[in-house]
């Protein structure tokens, strides 16, 4: 059976409700924290490291919730939301691979911000390159990612780490 390699907004909303990978498994956050409108490509191969990749998009409109509060008179998408979106996508990759448990961001290496998302932008694109997937007692992925706005790269993150846990009691 071939795995689905692209996901619509409705698919991602199903994932946020726990309906895509099954109860107790990886979920995306619900809106407003869901920072992705679609995954245009997901693969177990390819990417910079040949271990998998994801490409996803977020449509930008001036009425997005964060522009009203960050900052008044100087609206800009918080950089941490772009970083969170990359963690969301690494966790989605683990669920898509069939690894059981709830996703948790575990950290990252170097993060760089060298641009911004303004209300005049049209589209944010996320590119995730899987470096390694650990399967066993700990199921975890390590990836590098980037965020682009209207075709221009504005953030990068190295060593994004996300794990999935069948119990988060001691997390």
UniProtKB/Swiss-Prot annotation:
InterPro entries: FabA, FabA_FabZ, HotDog_dom_sf. The keyword Cell division does not apply. Pathway: Lipid metabolism; fatty acid biosynthesis. Its main location: cytoplasm. Keywords: Cytoplasm, Fatty acid biosynthesis, Fatty acid metabolism, Isomerase, Lipid biosynthesis, Lipid metabolism, Lyase. One of its GO terms (cellular component) is cytoplasm. One of its GO terms (molecular function) is (3R)-hydroxyacyl-[acyl-carrier-protein] dehydratase activity. Homodimer. Necessary for the introduction of cis unsaturation into fatty acids. Catalyzes the dehydration of (3R)-3-hydroxydecanoyl-ACP to E-(2)-decenoyl-ACP and then its isomerization to Z-(3)-decenoyl-ACP. Can catalyze the dehydratase reaction for beta-hydroxyacyl-ACPs with saturated chain lengths up to 16:0, being most active on intermediate chain length. This is 3-hydroxydecanoyl-[acyl-carrier-protein] dehydratase. It comes from Pseudomonas fluorescens (strain ATCC BAA-477 / NRRL B-23932 / Pf-5). The lineage of its organism: Bacteria, Pseudomonadati, Pseudomonadota, Gammaproteobacteria, Pseudomonadales.
């Amino acid at each position: 059976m071939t795995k689905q390699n692209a996901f619509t907004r409705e698919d991602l909303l199903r994932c946020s409700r726990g309906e895509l990978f099954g109860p107790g498994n990886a979920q995306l956050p619900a809106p407003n924290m869901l920072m992705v409108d679609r995954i245009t490509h997901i693969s177990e191969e390819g990417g910079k490291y040949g271990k998998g990749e994801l490409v996803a998009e977020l449509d930008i409109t001036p009425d997005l919730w964060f522009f009203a509060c960050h900052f008044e008179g100087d609206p800009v998408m918080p950089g941490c939301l772009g970083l969170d979106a990359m963690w969301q996508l690494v966790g989605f990759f683990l669920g898509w691979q069939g690894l059981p448990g709830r996703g948790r961001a575990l950290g990252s290496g170097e993060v760089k911000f060298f641009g911004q998302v303004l209300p005049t932008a049209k589209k944010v694109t996320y590119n995730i390159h899987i470096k390694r997937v650990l399967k066993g007692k700990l199921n975890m992925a390590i990836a590098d990612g980037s965020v682009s706005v209207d075709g221009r790269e504005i953030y990068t993150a190295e060593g994004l780490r996300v794990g999935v846990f069948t119990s988060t009691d001691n997390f």
